[in-house]
Amino acid sequence: MTATPVDKTYVMLMVADMARAMRFYTEAFAVTVAINSPYWSEFVVAGATIALHPGGSGNETHTGLGFEVKDLDAALQRVTETGGRITSPPRDRQQERIRVAEIADTEGNLITVAELIN
């Protein structure tokens, strides 16, 4: 089986208040807003995509790496075939229009892998 190409790479920051966080990044760093919603926002900084996700309180304040792919199932198959593991199985998040899973690479680094759904 061939490798699954990555369509977008992003760093995700968990935030408690989406509007406040977006205001901070746009006003402090003059970022270019690509997506702005209560469930997921993205801005572009020097070619890198930074994503903000609600839930940034308590133990959900981590920063994480994420990959957007066209075929989540194929990507997860390649993850396991190449020594990684699935730490959270695929699930649909209809409000965000994504199907998402979490994986660990061969070194234990956690990565979110998502596929856009309609």
Question: Which residues does each predicted region cover?
Answer:
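Short, intrinsically disordered, mixed-charge
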Residues: 27-30, 81
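Short secondary-structure junctions
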Residues: 30-35, 85-89
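Conserved short beta-strand elements that form part of the metal-binding/catalytic scaffold
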Residues: 31-63, 110-116
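Vicinal oxygen chelate
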Residues: 1-4, 8-16, 44, 57-82, 84-118, ...
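Short glycine/proline-centered loop/turn elements that form peptide/ligand docking sites
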Residues: 20-21, 38-41, 96, 118
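Conserved active-site alpha-helix within GNAT-family acetyltransferase domains
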Residues: 19-28, 101, 110
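N-terminal beta-strand motif that seeds the catalytic metal site of vicinal oxygen chelate
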Residues: 1-22, 47-49, 63-67, 114-118
